[in-house]
């Protein structure tokens, strides 16, 4: 298939600039794979569309406040580092701006100078290996003090509260972007879901900035996916296998949870406790084995994420659902509304 097959027209005003308040007040489009019906609901009504014995699989990765604004030593020139991936210890792979002026040996100070960084090397793709020095026990404490959330480029409004870009169950630090389908859940909603006999299990996939990288190749099969680290615990693997054995549904909350489970299935032919890196690319023609349902937001045109949705729900039905969402003025992208494909 071609990249242009996944294009749709989206008015700018439908790109959500802030989350729904409360979180579960977002709209929910319910798509039924058996009868092709489309229902329009609200996210706090999600429990009504779940069945006793279902299992929701959420991604518990936590977004790092990884965007650091600093000054070069000794010139005082303003620069920016965006932490992408921990290489080893206090050395991280970073996106640097202005990249050409941050050559190996460049020193940068942040805040009051209690956090500093030195550029070690420039990688072939232009990213940098950077080593940090700080006066606290962990680098994460300094990121909390000086860092900002690395919001997607289509969100131009500043957050009032950085927790708005974290799920309520986020715990494993490491993502450069939020697993946004989970932003709609509140503690109260999760309690209601559990009270109906629906289980909730956690996986971890640290979302990289590659999630926003456009597909440049015209033939989508030529696209190379970015690699992301994932982990599935023994408890989660057991819950998933018990759910499937009992004939109940495994429902992925978000494309990251979906990609985690499908990556494990692709590697082992079943769900087992494991961790590793995955660059799995799911698009029409790729069969999904690990999930029976998917909760997700509305994604960018021509993105790998809308291609994943089309693989699970069907290409024609996916594009028709997006056309309906635009007509019904759903809110799109990270802070937007959700769909539940069941």
Please provide the spans of the model-predicted regions.
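Surface-exposed, charge/polar-rich loops and edge strands
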Residues: 1-342
